[in-house]
Amino acid sequence: MSPRAARRLLVLLVVAALAVLVLAPTVKRVLRDITLPLQYTSVIRAQAHAKRLDPALIAAVIFAETKFDARTSPTGALGLMQIEPSTAQFLAHRSGATTFTLADLADPAVNIAYGSYYLRYLLNRYGQSETLALAAYNGGETNVDRWIERAHAAGARFTLSSIPFPQTRAYVARVEHAQASYARDYGL
């Protein structure tokens, strides 16, 4: 290789290295935004504060339910946090909402408020256990009550591995993983 070609190659390598250094944070941020999206941060933070919840938990539930892409599920659950109509009516009654309609759940702020209210309710019901609250959010309170009874009857503690529904067990693990990621990557 000629000295002139070697210099060109060296300059090219230096420019490439600088480009990588400059673009790496942007690429990392873009990849994070694709693989771990986050929207409605101010609503999430406000609801977390109002309901005494970890904002990363709210974001993780939204991620597990819809990846921040609101849509109606085949079961009829609504909005970002996929709230079942019967659960929404229960929450509206319990919270004293007087003008609530199911259509309100299409509004991300309302949906996050109701989903956060439900998470707080479940955490209170299950002794602040996020595992139990998340299992109930996904698998239903009646099922969780039954699973707790079975575990206690067997003289065991209820743990993630105690959940007999593979979908619910995977859901809880997915939310817990996403919660840690939101706390780490977004500082929630």
Model region roles, listed by residue range:
Residues R8-T26:
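Hydrophobic membrane-insertion alpha-helices, especially the h-region
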